[in-house]
Amino acid sequence: MAKARKPKNEEAPGAKTSENTGAKVLHQKLFLSIDFKKRQIYGYTELEVSVPDIGIVGLHAENLGIESVLVDGEPTVFEYYPHHQNSETESNWNSVSDPASAADAAAMEYVGVLKREDTANLLINCCKPSKDLSEQLDSVTLENGSQSSGEAKQNVKLIRINYWVEKIESGIHFDGNIVHTDNQMRRARCWFPCIDDEYHRCSFDLEFTVPHNFVAVSVGKLLYQVMCKEDTTQKTYVYELAIPIAPRWVSLVAGPLEILPDQTNFLISNLCLPHDLSRLRNTMEFFHEAYSYYEDYLSANFPFGFYKQVFLPPEMVVTSSTSGASLSIFSSHILYDERVIDQTIDTRIKLASALAKQWFGVYITPESPNDDWLLDGLAGFLTDMFIKQFLGNNEARYRRYKANCAVCKADDSGAMCLSSSPSCRDLFGTHSIGMHGKIRSWKSGAVLQMLEKQMGSDSFRKILQKIISRAKDPSNSIRSLSTKEFRQFANKIGNLERPFLKEFFQRWVASYGCPVLRIGLSYNKRKNNVEMAALRECTAALDARLSVIGATSDSESRDVDAGWPGIMSIRVYELDGMSDHPKLPMAGDRWQLLELPCHSKLAAKRYQKPKKGGKPDGAEDNVDAIAPLENKTSIESPLAWIKADPEMEYIAEIHLHQPLQMWVNQLEKDGDVVAQAQAIASLEALKQHSFSIVNALKNVLTDSKVFWRIRIAAAFALAKTASEESDWAGLQHLIKFYKSRRFDAEIGLPKPNDFRDFPEYFVLEAIPHAIAIVRGAEGKSPREAVEFILQLLKYNDNSGNSYSDVFWLAVLVQSVGDLEFCQQSLTFLAPLLKRIDRLLQFDRLMPSYNGILTISCIRTLAQTALKLSDSISFDHICKLIEPFRNSDTILQIRIEGSRALLDIEYQSKGISSALLLFMKYLVEESSLRGQVKLCVHTMRLCQIAVGCDSDDCVDTVTLLDLLHLFKSHVVFNNELLRYYLFCIFQILAGRPPTLFGVPKEKPLQLVDVEACIEPKNVFLVPGAEAGEPSLSALGDAKGQSLDVAPYGVPIIPQEMFMPIVPELMLPEPVAAYDETQHLEPRMESQNQPSHENPIVHEIPSDVEGPTEELAHREANPPTKEPQKEPDVVSVSVSHEVKKSVIRIKVRPSGATSRAEGSARTIERSQGIVVRHDIDRGQTSSASVDAPQRISTDAVSISNQNHVEEVNSCHDVGSRMTASIGSVKFASEGDIFGKELQCTAESGKPSTSQKADNNNRTVPPSFLPLDHSMENEAQQKYASLQTLSIGKEKEKKKDKEKKEKKRKREDPVYLEKKRLKKEKKRKEKEMAKLVSSTTDPAKKKIESVAEVKEEEPSDGAMLIKVEPKTEPSTAEARPLPKFRIKLKSKAFNNS
C-alpha cells in the first residue's frame, strides 16, 4: 500500500512557489456580461480566500480595468500594476551587433518576462481599511512573510472585484459575433482576476449574460438559463463546477452556435457554426464509442459529468485543439463530410486524444512541474489504446515504432529529460511547446508502454483504475499524481521490484539518451549456434548525461555508464520454428558476446560428382552445388532471420547486420508490421540493390494482404532503388503496378476513379509521389516519370465516384513540385503548368475541402520557380501568388501564399530580407494561428540559412527590429508566437531552439533594472532565494534542432495530404555549437541592479555564508604556518552560476590525517557548519608543482598502488587543466615519484576587489571559539570517527571483493590483467638497471605550494598544504598523497 500523502498545503518538490503570501482561493464566482455590439466585457468576481496573517492577498490580473474591490462588503485599498505596460519600455540594446548578442538580449528579455508573470500584480488589503496599504507593507515582519496559510489559523474573507476587460486581445477574443477563450498559459488573468497558477485549484460558479439568441457554453454543469428581468433581449447561462481546477482550464465560447446532442449518449454535446453542422454530424458518428471505451477501460464514469465539444473556424483558434474542464475547443478544419477519406483517421485520433486529456491532465493533475511528463504520457497511452481498439493493432504498432524512431534521433540533449529540475521547473511550461514538446510526449508514452510490458497489461490497467477511483473518493479525494506515487503503484500493484523501478526511473525519466545497439552475427555450423556480438552506445554523450543526473565521482560515472535496466530479447527464426533468447544485457560491458543455440539441424550433404554415364548436357548434375549466391545462407545455416527486441520493450536504435537473404525473408514472411518496416529500411539503406531486393519490395507492394502503410513504404523504397544501372527496374514496377490497378488495358488510359477500397486508395495515392522522387545519375527525374505524372493529371476522371478526389489531385500536383526537370523533360513543363493553372481557376470557382487543391498548387508553383530560377522569373510568380494573401481568403490559403513568398524572398535576397518580410506579414496577419504558422516557417528558413556554408548573415538593423517585435504587445498576446520568436534568435546564434540551457540569473538582473514601475515584492519569504540550475545542466544542450526539415531544402512541404505517419526528418547540427555560449554572461558593462528598487526580488548577498566559514578557518588554521589572508575576499552577486573549485589535500602521514579528521568531528558535534571544501567562487590563478621524489627506502605495495582521484571540469569563467605524470621507478625497493601540476587561469575576475575588501564584515560564529573546549572534544569524539572510518573501509572492501569476483569470470579482463602484469614485470627490471647507475641519496623531496593572491571573484581555489621535510637515509617516511578534486558548487543554492 502506498504511503500516506503529505498535506496539500506543503509545497511539493519542484513546484513553483506561489507569489501570493500563502493566500488560497477556496471558491470563485464569475459574473460576466458580454456586449456584442459595443464589444465590451464587464462584470465582477467573488473569491472566498483564506487570508494569511500578513493580511495581503496577491492575485494575477492583466488587461483589466479594476473599478473597485470590496472585502466582506467593505471597500478596501488595492494596488494594481499591469505587467504589459512596461513591456513596451525601451531597452539598452546598444551592445547588439551580431546574432549571438541578439540571442542573449532576447533570452534576458524572455526569462525576465516569464519571471515577472509569476509575480502577483493585484495586491488587496484584507485588514482594516483604516491603515494605508503601503504602511502595512512596511510593517510586515520577517515571520509573517514566511508563514503559510496551512500553518496559520484560517481567516476566510469574501473579496469582490468589479472590473471590465480593457483589451480583448489576449486570453479572450472577439471574432465577428463569437467570443471565445484560448486557454494559453498564464492568460486566464487576462479576462478575470485569479491566482493564475496551474498548481492552485478551486471550484467555480459561472454566470454569463449574452443576447437571447446566442449560446454561451462553459465548463461544468449547466444548471439553468434564464431571461434577464432588466433586459428581455439578454439571457443568462449559469454553470457550476464543483471539482477544483486551475483557472487556466476555465473556457468560454459564446455566439450563434448550433447544438448537436449525441444520439447515443445524452451527456455528450457538440456545437459549431450553422454552416458546419452537416460535417459535424458525419464526423461525430463514432465518438460515443471512444467515450464509452474510456469509461470501460478505467471502470469509472466521465469525471465532469457532461462533455462539450465546440468547433470554431481555424482563424479563431490558436491551436487545432484546446482543452478546458469538460470542454474542448477544436478547429473546424478537422471536420469532414461523407465524401472525404484522408481526414478521417487524423480527426478521430485528435478527438480521442483530447478526451484522454480530460482524464489525465485536467481531472488528474501533476503534483509539480517534474510530474508533467507522467500525465502527458498517461493521456498518450490512453489514446494508443483507442487506436489499437478501433483502428487496429497494426496501426497502433506502426505509429509507436515511428514515434520511437523519432525519439531516438532527438533524445540527445537535456531538453529531452522528462523529469529534472533544469528541464521542467525552470522552463516555465515551454517544454510542452513545439517539436520538443511533441518528442517529449512521444517519449512519455513510450516509457509507460515499456512499464506496461514489464508488469503486464492487466496490472497497468489496475494502476490507472486505482488513480481514478482514488480521485473520486469523496472522503479522501486526491486528484494530483506524482512520479513517486506512480512508482509505488508499480511496486505494489504491478509487482515490480523496487531496485528495478529505481534504476528504471533514474535512467529513463530522470536522465536522457537512448541505447544504440550495433549487432553482428555469425552461424557456427560445428556448434549449431549463432555467435552474436553486440556493441552498446548511447544517443547522448556520457558527460552530458552525468551533468543531468548530477554524478561527480568516478564510481558514479561508472554507474551512469552501466547502461539500462533489463535484458533485451533476441528472437531467432529457424527453418523449423521460432525461439526467444532473452540474453542481451542492457547493462554492464558495452561489448557483449552471445551464443544462441539453434534447434534446427541441416542434413549433411556431400558434393556428388557427375556419373560417368550421365547425359552429355549435364541434366543430372547436382543442382545444390551450383545454387545462386542469394540462397547460400539458407543452404549453409538453418537461420531464416533474426529480430532484436521484437516486442519493442526498449526505446532503442538497433543496427542489426544480417545477410541480405535474411532481410528478404523477414520482409516476406514476418507478419509483424514493425519487422517489415525494419526490413524495408535496411534494404533501402544498402548501397547496391540486387534483383532480389527489388523483387521482394515489388511483392510486398502488390500483396493486398500486407498492411497498407508497409506497402507505401515499399513503394518509396522501390523509388530509391531505381537507377540507370538497374535499367530503372524500381520505376518500371511502380508504373506497372499503378497501371494494373487504375488503367484500362484496352485503351491504355486511366479509368474513372473508384475509391471504395480504402487501403488500396491510400497505396495508389502514394505511387505518383514515389515516382516523382526517382532520380538519375545527375539528380534529374527520368523522362518516363515526368510523362507519366502529366498523363495522370490530364486524364483524371472523378465522375461516378462517391468520394472526393481533392486529396488525390493535391498529391498529383505536389508530385509535379517534386520533379527535377532535365533538358529532355523540359518540354513537359508547359503542359504541366497549364494543368495547374486550370486547377487553380477551378478551385477558385468551386472551393475544395479546406482549400487543399489551391494550397498544393501554390506550393508546387513556388517549388518549380525555385528549381528553375534561370527560366522562370520570380517577379511573375510573386504577382501570381500575392492575391492569395488577401484577408478575405481562408486562413490555410493565406498562410501558404505567405510561406511561398517568404521562400522566394530568402532564395533571391537572403535571410535578412526574408526576416523583414516576415515581420511585415506578421503585423498584417490578424489571426493568432496564422502568426504562429508564419513564425514556425521563418524558423525553418533560419535553420536552413545557419546550416549553409554561405556568408549570408543577419544585419544589425534586422536584429534590432526583431527585438522590438519580440518586446511588443502583439507578441505578449500570443504565447506560442513569443516562444517561436525566441527560438529564431537562438537558431541565428547557432544554439538549440529551446529555453533549456539559457542562464536564469543574469537575465533576471537586467530585467530588474528595466522594470522600474512594478510593485515591491511583498510576498518574498525573506532569506530565501530562487533556485539556480547547475552549471552542468545549463551546458549540456546541443545544437540539434527538431523543428525543421533537412538543410538545403528550399521548401519544406507539410505531410498534410497523406495520413501516413511521417518519418521525422531531422537536420544536421546547425553549427559547431559552443556550449559555453549559453553560460558566458554577456553585456558585462551592465550595472548591477539596485536592491532598493521596489519591484525586484531582493537577492541576499552570497558573501555571508562563505565569510562565516572563513572566520572559522582563520581562527583554526589547518596548517602550522599562519594564514595571511583568505583566498576568497568576496563573492560577486552578478555571477551566480556555479563555479569549479580545486581542492588539493596533502596528507603526509596517517596520524596527521586522523588528528585533522578529529578536529572536523568536533566541529560537527558542536553544530558548527564548517565546509572545508567550500566553494569560493571563481578560481584564482595558482600552480602547485610536486617534483619527482626518489628515496632509497622501501615503500609498501599499498602506497605504490594508491589510486589518485582526479575529476576534471571545464568552467565557463576560467580555464583549468590538470595533469599527472607517469610513475617512474628509481630503485629496487619499488620507490616511485610522481609529477603533479595543476593550473587554473581565471577567466573573469571580479572588478570590485577593493570595495569588497573594505565593506566585508565577518559575522560572529555560532559558538565562541575556545581552544580548550576543542581539545576536550577532540579526545571525546576521536574514537567515534575511527569507528565510522572502519565501517567505510569494510563497505569498500566488500564492494571490491564483488567487483573482483565479477572480473575473474570475464575473459577479456583476465587477458588485460595478464598483459598488465607482464608490462609491470618489464618495468621493474628496467628500474633495477636504472637504480644501479643512480645515487638516490643526493635527491631531495620538494613540496611547494604557491598561492598567488588574485582579485576576489565568484570562484576561489583553496589550497591546503602540510609542511614537508627532507628525508634522510636513516629515516623512512611514507610518501605524501596528493588528492585533487574538481567540484562544481554554488553558494546559497536554495
Swiss-Prot record:
One of its GO terms (cellular component) is transcription factor TFIID complex. Residues 1313-1322 have a biased composition (Basic residues). It is found in: Nucleus. Residues 1109-1127, 1286-1297, 1336-1347 have a biased composition (Basic and acidic residues). Residues 1286-1333 form a coiled coil. One of its GO terms (biological process) is transcription by RNA polymerase II. The keyword Glycoprotein does not apply. It comes from the Eukaryota. Keywords: Activator, Coiled coil, Nucleus, Transcription, Transcription regulation. GO terms for molecular function: metallopeptidase activity; zinc ion binding. Residues 1-20, 1104-1132, 1240-1377 are annotated as: Disordered. Expressed in roots, leaves and inflorescences. Its main location: nucleus. Residues 1244-1258, 1271-1284 have a biased composition (Polar residues). TAFs are components of the transcription factor IID (TFIID) complex that is essential for mediating regulation of RNA polymerase transcription. Belongs to the TAF2 family. Component of the TFIID complex. TFIID is composed of TATA binding protein (TBP) and a number of TBP-associated factors (TAFs) whose MWs range from 14-217 kDa. This is Transcription initiation factor TFIID subunit 2. The gene is TAF2.
